[in-house]
């Protein structure tokens, strides 16, 4: 396979440029909205205005948390020398783990406003997220960023600009963290489940998928490996997710309340 070298700019209007990466985020929020809307048809617990607020709060959390998380976890030194890079979102540079923290904070605020239970809301939100993650990884692929390690494997992709082949880990993540995780959570949550269990499965499976893919993903050059010449920042951030997910899932089985 050969990397198609897609122009990251969809349309140049002169006074503004429209980027594929930004469009992927729009697709993510639209997909979350329509998935949520299809779910509330079967439930009297949600009103349309609450759903719209939920997506708005989530979008703010994703964008602010994702960008600040990337700066803090992956690019703090460049930010200190040039704070303006925080606004250069069109070039990529979003952290899933930062986005997750941003969504958690935004959901705390949402639940405070509507006096809802935090975990019941998160159980509703969790199945809406994976397709958006998949769109984001496709945006990374179009941007030509977050490649895997150099490889001569038939699963690798030839990159003409570098004259080498690398694992297209963006596509692996789009498939596992996007499509497969969506199917798991959507089917699981289609029936009544104990409170926290859907949120727990999201943490477990995302953490596992990300941890595994990191073995063939090229670590950030300015960070490298954190320990033992194989532990990456992504793995260091994902492992606690798995542990927390297992804990919440075990706790949910002792919880009689239903999401």
Tell me what each language-model feature is.
Residues 1-259:
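A feature for loop-to-transmembrane-helix boundaries and adjacent hydrophobic helices
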């Amino acid at each position: 396979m050969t990397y198609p070298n897609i122009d990251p700019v969809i349309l140049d209007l002169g006074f503004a440029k429209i980027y594929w990466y930004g469009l992927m985020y729009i697709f993510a929020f639209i997909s979350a909205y329509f998935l949520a809307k299809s779910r509330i048809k079967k439930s009297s617990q949600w009103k349309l205005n609450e759903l719209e607020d939920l997506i708005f709060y989530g979008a703010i959390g994703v964008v602010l948390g994702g960008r600040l998380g990337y700066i803090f976890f992956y690019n703090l030194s460049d930010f200190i020398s040039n704070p303006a890079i925080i606004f250069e979102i069109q070039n990529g540079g979003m952290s899933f783990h930062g986005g997750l923290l941003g969504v958690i904070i935004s959901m705390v605020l949402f639940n405070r406003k509507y006096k809802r239970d935090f975990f019941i809301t998160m159980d509703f939100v969790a199945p809406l997220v994976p397709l958006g993650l998949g769109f984001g990884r496709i945006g990374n692929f179009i941007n030509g960023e977050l490649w895997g390690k150099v490889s001569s494997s038939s699963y690798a992709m030839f990159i003409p600009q570098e004259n080498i082949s690398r694992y297209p880990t963006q596509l692996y993540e789009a498939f596992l963290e996007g499509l497969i995780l969506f199917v798991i959570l959507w089917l699981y949550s289609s029936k009544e489940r104990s409170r926290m269990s859907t949120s727990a499965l999201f943490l477990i499976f995302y953490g596992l998928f990300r941890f595994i893919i990191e073995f063939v993903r090229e670590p950030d050059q300015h960070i490298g490996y954190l320990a033992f010449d194989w532990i990456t920042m992504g793995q260091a951030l994902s492992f606690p997710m798995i542990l927390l997910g297992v804990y919440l899932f075990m706790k949910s089985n002792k919880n009689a309340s239903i999401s």
